[in-house]
UniProtKB/Swiss-Prot annotation:
Binding-site residues for S-adenosyl-L-methionine, renumbered to this chain: R104, D105, E120, R121, D174
The protein, known as: Ribosomal RNA small subunit methyltransferase J
Function (record text): Specifically methylates the guanosine in position 1516 of 16S rRNA.
Enzyme class: transferase
Catalytic reactions of this protein: guanosine(1516) in 16S rRNA + S-adenosyl-L-methionine = N(2)-methylguanosine(1516) in 16S rRNA + S-adenosyl-L-homocysteine + H(+)
An annotated GO cellular component: cytoplasm
A single GO molecular function term of this UniProt record: rRNA (guanine-N2-)-methyltransferase activity
Taxonomic superkingdom: Bacteria
UniProt KW keywords: Cytoplasm, Methyltransferase, rRNA processing, S-adenosyl-L-methionine, Transferase
EC number(s) recorded for this UniProt protein: 2.1.1.242
Pfam families recorded: SAM_MT
Amino acid sequence: MNIQLICETENSQNFTALCKEKGLTHDPASVLALVQTETDGEVRLELRKLDEPKLGAVYVDFVAGTMAHRRKFGGGRGEAIAKAVGVKGNELPSVIDATAGLGRDAFVLASIGCRVRLVERHPVVYLLLQDGLRRAYADPEIGEMMQKNMQLLPVHHITELNPFEDFADVVYLDPMYPHKQKSALVKKEMRVFQYLVGADSDSNLLLEPALKLAKKRVVVKRPDYAEFLAEKAPQFSRETKNHRFDIYSVNV
C-alpha cells in the first residue's frame, strides 16, 4: 500500500522496519500519512489526512481519553455489546474480534474480563492497533489486564485460523458499512479512518468462517438501516439507538 510515511522522532529505524514488514511504501503524493511522533515524551503512531488537518490525527489510546472514561464510567456488563456476546453472571465468553479496527469494542469486552483475540487485515490499521496495545501493555494501571485479555493475532483474516485450534465462544464482526451522509460527518476521526479503509466490499464472506470458529454464537454489529450480513437472517437481534447486534447461534 502507498501512503506517506513520516517520522518525527529521532529514532526512525523501528518505524522503517514496521512499515517494511507490512508492505507499506512511501508515496509523497498521498494525502494520507502514517506518522511516528512524540507527545509528552511518549512515542506513538498516528494517521493523518494532510489535506484536512482540522480533522486531527487518528491513533489508538486505551490508557487515557475516551476509552479510559468508558472503562471507568461506562456501562460495563450492562453495555449492549456485553449482552450481545453473552456476558451474564460469572460467564465471560472468549471472543475473536475478526474486524478489530481501532480495538474499541474489544477493549470494552476486555475491561469486563473477557479474553479477546483480535484480527485486523488492513496493514495501517494493524500498526495503529499494535502501537496502542504496546503502550497499554506498559501502563501501570491497566497493563496486566490488557496483556491477559487483549491479544492481536499475527494473521490478517479469520480464514487463516484453524477452527479446531483457534476457536472461541464468540466471533464478533463489525465490518465497515457505507454511512448515510449526515452520520458520516458526526465524528471527524471516522472520516479519516473511512478514507483509509473504505467499505468492506467482501464482508459477506466473513460470516461462514466465523460460524466455523464460534462455539456458541457469532455477533454482527450493523447500522440500524443495514441489511443482514450475507443476506442471512439471525436467530435474534439486540437493538440500540443507531445500531443492532445480529446474533447467530451455533448448533441450533
